[in-house]
């Protein structure tokens, strides 16, 4: 896959005018030959290389690493039974798709790992597990438990095997991993764009995915489960794939209602997002210095509509 970077003016994406804090974004467009063109923009040119907090967008990266690791190493099968503290039938894929029944936070956080669900008002301090496959409880605990399982199988800390599995092959050299596989990535928007570009054009990429591989990765897991999408409230069908969100019919949402239901993505409480429309050949990414709040909720749907429109116009 050839990735070519260019720059954008404010007029290309008018919704940018509403952001009064440091940010950087990327627009990706897949061409007919499989190459991916990337245009970037930022509040200041220096912010294009600035490492921003990804927070929960980390889950998107880690999910890709799990999928690749499961294809390359059958010992890390996503159908591995998890065991305690989950119900007997819960598998690794159920952790990644947030249908294990576990609460948002681990009951006892490790030193240096804050209970973010409590901190952000998403979860109660006394939250308990429920029966699996009855409700989709978005959960950092799921990813941290999955990361611990992978460490035992692979024999390396999650930071190391995710770096070797995804970051190094894609040249995501500015991204640093620490703390938690649910929220611990910090890096520039160019790295996030490289990740999105790999999923836009996998068969010309470097991770070895086929389109069929990604069809499996993006397939809905236990569709129809209601649940709370942090920042956006209750959803009748809080649709998820293997560690990445599916747009589905969620509303309200950071993606506009005009987006197809099969678009995958993730957003983070740091004010970050990534999404990939594999069918249309368009993708977008955003990182910023202001925590997710009213300005993001107000502007992101329009911004993402403009990103997708621009990406489609640029196709050759």
Residues covered by each model-derived region:
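Solvent-exposed, conformationally flexible loop/turn segments
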Residues: 49, 75-79, 133
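Amphipathic, well-packed alpha-helical segments that form the structural scaffold of globular domains
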Residues: 125-127, 147, 197
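Well-ordered alpha-helical segments within folded domains of soluble proteins
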Residues: 60-63, 141-147, 190-194
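Active-site helix/loop module of the DD-peptidase/beta-lactamase fold
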Residues: 54-57, 69-107, 141, 148, ...
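Catalytic loop of the DD-peptidase/beta-lactamase superfamily, centered on the K-T-G motif
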Residues: 1-44, 49-53, 58, 135, ...
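Short, charged, amphipathic alpha-helices and their helix-cap/turn boundaries
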Residues: 25, 29-40, 94-97, 102-132, ...
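Solvent-exposed loop/turn segments at secondary-structure junctions
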Residues: 102, 143, 290-292
